[in-house]
Structure formats: C-alpha cells, structure tokens
C-alpha cells in the first residue's frame, strides 16, 4: 500500500511538471517565459561580452565619476543608461533577423535619444567648473552609433575616442599635479572606448551581426526587450485593431451628424453601385479627341493662397539670449555679446579664468593677470589682454583678432577660420599650436609697426626609412 501511495505521488509530481512545461511552450512571444529565460542568463556570447564591458569598464568609470560628484556624476549616470539601452538593442539583435532599414531606424531611437540627452546636458552646463569633463563625454558619446556603421564600425569608435582626447588632455593638464582623481577619471573613460573597439573586432567586425534564425525584428516583437528589464513582467500586448466605426445615432448628449457627413456615408455604403451615378462623356467633350479643346490649354484649378500665421516668423527666428558679463566663482563668463566694443574686465586675480562664448562683432579687454582665456564659438571678435600665465584657446570661431600686451606662454587655435595674433615684444617666445584651422597670421612688432607672418596650413610628410618626417610645404615666395 505504501508503495502504491509513493507511486501516485511521483505520478502527480510528473504530471504537474509536464503541465508547467506545456504552458511555458504555449506562451506568446515576449511573455513571461521569455523573460524568465533571460533572467536565467541564456544569452548570446556577444551579449555576454557586452555585459562584461558594462560591469567592468563602465562600472569603473561610474565609480570614478561618483567620486568627483556633481555634474560629472550626473553625466556618467546618463552614459550608463545609454550603454544599458545599447545592451537591450544587442540582445534583440542576437534573437531576431534584420528588418527593413526604416524599421532599424525606429529600433535605434532609444539609443539616439540617450545620446542626445548626454549632449544636451553639456550645452546646458557651459558654466560648469567641470566643463572639460562634460565636453569629453559629449564629443565622444556618438561612438555608440557604431551599430549603424558598416563595414568598419571599429575605426568609427576610434575616431570618436580621438575627439574625446582633445578635452581629456585639458583635464590632465589642469589636474595631473593637483588631484589624481581626475586622472583616474580620464583613464577609466578612455578605457571604455578602447575595450568597445576590441569587443566590436571580436563580435561585429564588419558591422552589426544579426541572428540568422528567429522572427524578423520589429517594434512589436522587440518592445519587451527594449523597454523591460529582466525579471519584470512584460508590457501587455497591443490592443486588437479597432472594429468598424459605430453608426451615427441621434442620442442625447451626442453631436448631431451634419447632412454632408450623412450623405458621404450614404454614398460610401453604395459600394460598386456608386458608379451608376456617373454620366457618359461624349467624344466632342474629350480633350484628347477634340483639337479645339486642346488649343484652349489646360484649365487650372484655382489655388488658395496661404497666408503665413503670425507665429510662423517667430518660430523660425533664432532664440535670443541675454548677454552675460559676470564673475562666477573663479570664472569670468562673457556670453552672447553683440556689437559691443566697450567690454572691459579690470578686477582680475591670478587664479581666475575667462570663458568667452558666442560673442559677435564685439571687443573685450582683460586687464591684469589671469590664469587662462577661452574663446568659443565667436565671430568677428577682438580680444586684448595683459598677461596670461596658462593658455589662450580659440575654438570653433571665425574672424578673431587677439592682441597680447604682456606675456602668454601658449596660444591654441582649433577649428577656427581666420585668426590674427598681435604679439608684444615680451610674448615673442610663446608657443602657437593649431589644428583644423585656416587663415592664421602672426604679427610681430618691428619698430612702430607690425610685420605679418602666415602660419602654415599645408604640410609635407616623407618616410626616411625609420620614421615619418613632417614639415610645412612652403609654396609661397
């Protein structure tokens, strides 16, 4: 009897287990069974490798950013969110076949929104003391767009990494002798992109590798992967398509159908019988059979002239910003100045810096001695200063004139069209570093006047058997 009871218990256990397995097999795609399988870690090797990158390199960067706190930490959290969005996309890629190109663009939208959020954060915090940190991230986060690059996504990531080093070098220059936490931050951030290049080389060498089995990816099939985390209940399935519209009935509280709308639905309900109302057109009224009608030319239907709304001109005009000339902590902010030639900063200290942004047709004079000056996104702007102990930088600008009254060790010119440097006798030993710029001239004093020397824009590189030798290509007489 005991053996019989034990056998019955084992049979009941087996039946219940089979029922559970059967219900799991019949679950619709995106159901709880799929989420449970994901929570058990059944993922493709490429996704596992990407998880390792997030859990090691991105986590290390996030830890170092939390040490610096403030805007850097907030920015790093956004970066972590962008990598999580890319991880969800790669998971979908490993389980689905490649869809049409327009569908791929829709599926990439969560990642592109994360990238845009990171770049917008930098633009909204230009006055931040950690602006170089934010710029390093903002200028390189587009590397996550490698998933849309073929056949060589790896070099694309390297190109974005190079864009970051322009700003990380600034961070290293400012903190390498004073605060090593920033040095660790730079190393951990750049390590992310070098590891991502290695990941791409191993798993997606010539472009994104989609699954060759499974359903074709779509917004419906991938919704649960892109928007739900492992272990969470999936979103409900989309509602069924709506049925035919209800008939218009004269009920209390409902809008009365207009006669024209009722007539329209009455005609639609005729079906093919609607063509019975068409009358026959005789040959003398057909243009292609009647030369006299052709001679009259085409009859053009009257077109309605569209008057622009009063708000259209406002929406197209660029947004005006209030001009700024103020001291924030140790930073002088000079922003959005237009047609001002009387700007002066006279009360300066050695530890102060000046940041000049989006000034047009203006001139600024800085008296005394400051640490550094940055001219960013300015046009037809003149700068006169006494002494700078660090560096003067000009970036993303056009038609800039700088006059040095005292001394400056380094002047950097990047992505600028037109920059004239008037040096004093005490500043003749300064270093001038330029990149991606044109129409640069240095004017040195000679008696009571200046002599102009152009900075080379064209270079010649040769191989001498052991190394590359680069020198200016002198083509001027």
From Swiss-Prot:
- Kindly list the positions at which N-acetylalanine occurs in this protein: 2
Keyword Cytoplasm assigned to the entry: answer is: no
Q: Which residues carry this modification: Phosphoserine?
A: 301, 309
The organs and tissues expressing this protein are described as: Found at relatively high levels in testes, at moderate levels in brain, heart and skeletal muscle, at lower levels in lung, skin, kidney and small intestine, and is undetectable in liver or spleen.
Report membrane topology: Peripheral membrane protein
Q: Which InterPro entries match?
A: Adenylate_cyclase-assoc_CAP, Adenylate_cyclase-assoc_CAP_C, C-CAP_CF_C-like, CAP/MinC_C, CAP_C_sf, CAP_CS_C, CAP_CS_N, CAP_N
The chain positions of domain C-CAP/cofactor C-like read: 318-455
Name where it mostly resides: membrane
Bias (Pro residues) occurs at: 231-248
Alphabetically ordered keywords of this record:
Acetylation, Cell membrane, Membrane, Phosphoprotein
Question: Which parts of this chain are annotated as the region Disordered?
Answer: 224-262, 274-324
Q: Name one GO biological process term.
A: cytoskeleton organization
- Gene3D superfamilies in the record, alphabetically? 2.160.20.70, Adenylate cyclase-associated CAP, N-terminal domain
Q: Name one GO molecular function term.
A: adenylate cyclase binding
GO CC annotation terms, alphabetical: cytoplasm; glutamatergic synapse; plasma membrane; postsynapse; postsynaptic density
Compositional bias annotation for Low complexity: 300-318
Q: In its keyword annotation, does this UniProt entry include Phosphoprotein?
A: yes
Name its cellular compartments: Cell membrane
- What PANTHER family does the record tag this protein with? ADENYLYL CYCLASE-ASSOCIATED PROTEIN (PTHR10652), ADENYLYL CYCLASE-ASSOCIATED PROTEIN 2 (PTHR10652:SF2)
Instruction: Identify its protein family.
Output: Belongs to the CAP family.
The role this protein plays is: Involved in the regulation of actin polymerization.
Protein name from the UniProt record: Adenylyl cyclase-associated protein 2
- Gene encoding this polypeptide? Cap2
């Amino acid at each position: 009897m005991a053996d019989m009871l034990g056998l019955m218990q084992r049979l009941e256990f087996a039946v219940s287990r089979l029922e559970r397995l059967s219900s799991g097999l019949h679950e619709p795609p995106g159901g709880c069974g799929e989420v449970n399988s994901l929570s058990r870690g059944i993922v493709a090797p490429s996704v596992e490798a990407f998880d390792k990158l997030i859990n090691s390199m991105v986590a290390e960067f996030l830890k170092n950013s939390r040490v610096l706190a403030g805007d850097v930490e907030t920015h790093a959290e956004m970066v972590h969110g962008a990598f999580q969005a890319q991880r969800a996309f790669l998971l979908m890629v490993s389980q689905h076949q490649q869809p049409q190109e327009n569908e791929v663009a829709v599926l990439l939208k969560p990642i592109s929104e994360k990238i845009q959020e990171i770049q917008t954060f930098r633009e909204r915090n230009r006055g931040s003391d950690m602006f170089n940190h934010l710029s390093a991230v903002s200028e390189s986060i587009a590397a996550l767009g490698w998933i849309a690059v073929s056949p060589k996504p790896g070099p694309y990531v390297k190109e974005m990494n190079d864009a970051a080093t322009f700003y990380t070098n600034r961070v290293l220059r400012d903190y390498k002798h004073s605060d090593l936490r920033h040095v660790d931050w730079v190393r951990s951030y750049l390590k992310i992109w070098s590891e991502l290049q290695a990941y791409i080389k191993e798993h997606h060498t010539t472009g994104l590798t989609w699954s060759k089995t499974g359903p074709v990816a779509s917004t419906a099939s991938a919704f649960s992967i892109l928007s739900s985390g492992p272990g969470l209940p999936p979103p409900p399935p989309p509602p069924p398509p709506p049925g035919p519209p209800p008939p218009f009935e004269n009920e209390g509280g409902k809008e009365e159908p207009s006669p024209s709308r009722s007539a329209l639905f009455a005609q639609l309900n005729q079906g093919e019988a609607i063509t019975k109302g068409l009358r026959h057109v005789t040959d003398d009224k057909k243009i292609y059979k009647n030369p006299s009608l052709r001679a009259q030319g085409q009859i053009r239907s009257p077109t309605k002239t569209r008057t622009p709304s009063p708000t259209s001109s406002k929406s197209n005009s660029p947004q005006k910003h209030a001009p700024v000339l103020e001291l924030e902590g140790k930073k002088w902010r000079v922003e959005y100045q237009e047609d001002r030639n009387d700007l002066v900063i006279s009360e300066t200290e050695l530890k102060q810096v000046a940041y000049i942004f989006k000034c047009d047709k203006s001139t600024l004079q800085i008296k005394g001695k400051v640490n550094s000056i940055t001219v960013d996104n300015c046009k037809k702007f003149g700068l006169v200063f006494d002494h700078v102990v660090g560096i003067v930088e000009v970036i993303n600008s056009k038609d800039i004139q700088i006059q040095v009254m005292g001394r400056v060790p380094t002047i950097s010119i990047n992505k600028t069209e037109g920059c004239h440097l008037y040096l004093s006798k005490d500043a003749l030993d300064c270093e001038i570093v330029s990149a991606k710029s044109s129409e640069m001239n240095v004017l040195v004093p000679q008696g009571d006047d200046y002599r102009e020397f152009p900075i080379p824009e064209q270079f010649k590189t040769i191989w001498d058997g052991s190394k590359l030798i680069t020198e200016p290509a002198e083509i001027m007489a």
